[in-house]
């Protein structure tokens, strides 16, 4: 499980990216790279990391569910994810 401060930091970055998204796009279209550079670092979407919404784990995260592989398997076996079941052939 990730530290809470890491998860909180990533959530804060998500909010900053949303806040500056339109302004960043306008500046890119205008080609005003000087003004782009003056925006906060965390306003860049490349600074975001996909993390598990339950544990905060950064690796092995499925974008579609927002869960890491461990939690995804656990929830699938418990039947908490509709339409997902263990494969057998």
Swiss-Prot record:
Family matches, as Gene3D superfamilies: 30s Ribosomal Protein S14, Chain N
InterPro entries for this protein: Ribosomal_uS14, Ribosomal_uS14_bac/plastid, Ribosomal_uS14_CS, Ribosomal_uS14_sf
Keywords, comma-separated and alphabetical: Ribonucleoprotein, Ribosomal protein, RNA-binding, rRNA-binding
Molecular function via GO: rRNA binding; structural constituent of ribosome
Xref: Pfam families: Ribosomal_S14
GO annotation, cellular component aspect: cytoplasm; small ribosomal subunit
Highest taxon of source: Bacteria
GO annotation terms (biological process): translation
Family: Belongs to the universal ribosomal protein uS14 family.
Functional note: Binds 16S rRNA, required for the assembly of 30S particles and may also be responsible for determining the conformation of the 16S rRNA at the A site.
Record text on subunit structure and interactions: Part of the 30S ribosomal subunit. Contacts proteins S3 and S10.
HAMAP family to which the protein is assigned, alphabetical: Ribosomal_uS14_1
Protein's UniProt name: Small ribosomal subunit protein uS14
Organismal lineage: Bacteria, Pseudomonadati, Chlorobiota, Chlorobiia, Chlorobiales
Recorded name of the encoding gene: rpsN
């Amino acid at each position: 499980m990730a530290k809470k401060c890491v998860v909180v930091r990533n959530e804060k970055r998500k909010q900053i990216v949303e806040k500056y998204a339109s302004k960043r796009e306008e500046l890119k279209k205008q080609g005003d790279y000087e003004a782009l550079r003056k925006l906060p670092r965390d306003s860049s979407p490349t600074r975001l990391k996909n993390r598990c919404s339950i544990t905060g784990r950064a690796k092995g995260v499925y974008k579609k569910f927002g869960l890491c592989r461990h939690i995804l398997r656990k929830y699938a076996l418990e039947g908490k994810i509709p339409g997902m079941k263990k494969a057998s052939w």
